[in-house]
């Protein structure tokens, strides 16, 4: 694979945009745009003569990268339909289907008879660190100067005198998105670098989405929408889990004898009742689960270093990826692709360790995203990597391994 030039994924200017559609019988349609680098902004109303033509001209300018928040699933389909000639009533119908029925853009194209615009576009919704967090919450966390709620219900038919309030609200959201765009510069720069390396547009993807897109391309895997989860999955401890603790051995036996029910809705294994009970181990108590191990005895802890006491924090490099490799967990992709997956994953791991030890942070960070993001997709029912048995094996084995370490450390005199 020949890396592409970084310039393939960058444009001179960022056009941050937001869309408003308000009303039922006589809806109004507004697009607000701010050109970040030029400090210019403009509002485009459907009812105002010439505005849609001006917006169309702006959209055709190849110097712009269009940036929005959740814009891939809402704003861009709406603007695309408007540029295809739809009026506000038709746009409102599309808006309702996008929001209430959660239809995807490609479904909207078929149902409403338009094509998505091919503008250069970044949606920062998945790039931002939270999951399903609103723009207003990000604005609050960043200390944005003003938080404005829409002063009207989205079904209200507005009077012309009320239009300026809608425009003020829309531009405030554009400003918040602009702040978020700047806040995410490091994350977006990394995505541009990785897009150039792998030849895929990764700029709007979360870490896990990037990992899936890259490895899918390398292995030529296909996605077929939502998977049919199995009714149950089981667990078997890998060979590297060994201990003389009767408590841990009892947990291993219970886990091995359990059929974990898989939720048919989200595809995740459900926690059996016995895992809800805290485990007493040495000096502490611990809560196991599908997600991870949590201590319950040290809700608050204060330790001060001194001449006699050293406080250390040890980081385990790529913990879950190491569990995947050392346990020999191979996805059932068929046609030898599971084995190729593990080989590719192991190669990525060794490349990351080399980059980390040599001080190449850019490469190390990008490969870390691939490693951790891939694990994150094992439990996603929509992912090509969906494997609830492997997700369970990774998380449970990781917890048992930590418990074995805790047990061994507490046997050391003075620990």
Residue ranges and their predicted role:
Residues 23-31, 365-366:
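Short, flexible loop/turn motifs enriched in small residues
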Residues 12-22, 122-123, 312-314:
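Two-metal-ion RNase H-like nuclease active-site motif
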Residues 1-12:
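N-terminal accessory regions of nucleic-acid-interacting proteins
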Residues 39-415:
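Conserved acidic
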Residues 19-21, 35, 373:
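Hydrophobic side chains in beta-strands
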Residues 9, 23-27, 305:
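A short catalytic or substrate-binding loop motif that flags glycine-/basic-rich loops and adjacent residues
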Residues 27-39, 317:
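Short conserved beta-strand segments at catalytic cores or DNA/RNA-binding microdomains
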Residues 13, 30-32, 310:
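Conserved beta-strand and immediately adjacent loop positions that scaffold enzyme active sites
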